Amino acid sequence: MIFKQQSLLRNAFTVVLTLALLSACASGGVSSNNSSTSNQFVLSAEDIGESGATEIIRFRTEDSEDLWGSVFGQGEIAIVLSHMRGRDQSSWFPFARLASEVGYKVLTFDFRGYGKSTGTKNTRMDRDLEAAVAYVRAYGAKQVVLIGASMGGTASIELAPEVEVQAVAALSPPTSFGRVNALDAVKSMLIPLLLIVAENDPPFTGDARSLETAAAATQFFELPGQQHGTNLFSEHSDQISGILLSFIGRWTDDSLIAVEETES
């Protein structure tokens, strides 16, 4: 089947990018930086820890919530990773590192109410994700792929046509979560969609099947076990990583991938 990206006008909104330098003090606090040209935090080796991130960022949503995120790698193809309920952006760090090594820019972030992000949990995920997409585009992304786990997958599916991304993938997505409804979105969505779910993860196995049936353009993988969302990586890490990277590569322009320069 030939996928055709749906062309929809994005809602106009202003995203305020608020960035500062991380202090190097032992307390790990954030020191303010008044430079209007700074676009990143500077991390010490201790700050980076096991995440492998190259930047820690803070950006603002349309309704003035401050969200914290981590940027991995560089390049003009950006992957925005959205976490599931009860977890935070760190659940995506292993895949973010892997994808950045391939040559993609990757953004993980905490939905409002999670981690250091302000606001009430499990509300207005659409605005949070919209702000995340605006951030990567403001800093050079020419193509964007959304990937989410559970509620993050539902939000990614619903928002994908509105922000005109290249493709969207979801791990164990419910058909709806709060005000976010993925089932309604897929009925008219022509953007490439990838669904991954465990075969014994009720009700999410059934939800993923419903999304697959309703969607016009879908790849569907049902894996053994009962793990949910990013917990699927614990049993199927290599397989899921391979599926995701293959999907991303199929629907993006590989000439935009960052290539590490070598000395001649």
Regions found by a protein language model. Give the residues of each.
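N-terminal cap/lid segment of alpha/beta-hydrolase-fold proteins
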Residues: 37-72
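The serine-hydrolase catalytic nucleophile loop
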Residues: 85-97, 206-207
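Short beta-strand/loop motif that positions the catalytic acidic residue
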Residues: 189, 195-197
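Alpha/beta-hydrolase active-site loop
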Residues: 91, 120-139
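Conserved alpha/beta-hydrolase
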Residues: 98-116
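Catalytic histidine-centered segment of alpha/beta-hydrolase-like enzymes
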Residues: 226-237
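Gly/Ala-rich beta-loop-alpha elbow adjacent to hydrolase catalytic centers
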Residues: 147-156
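C-terminal motif of bacterial Sec signal peptides marking the signal peptidase cleavage site
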Residues: 22-24
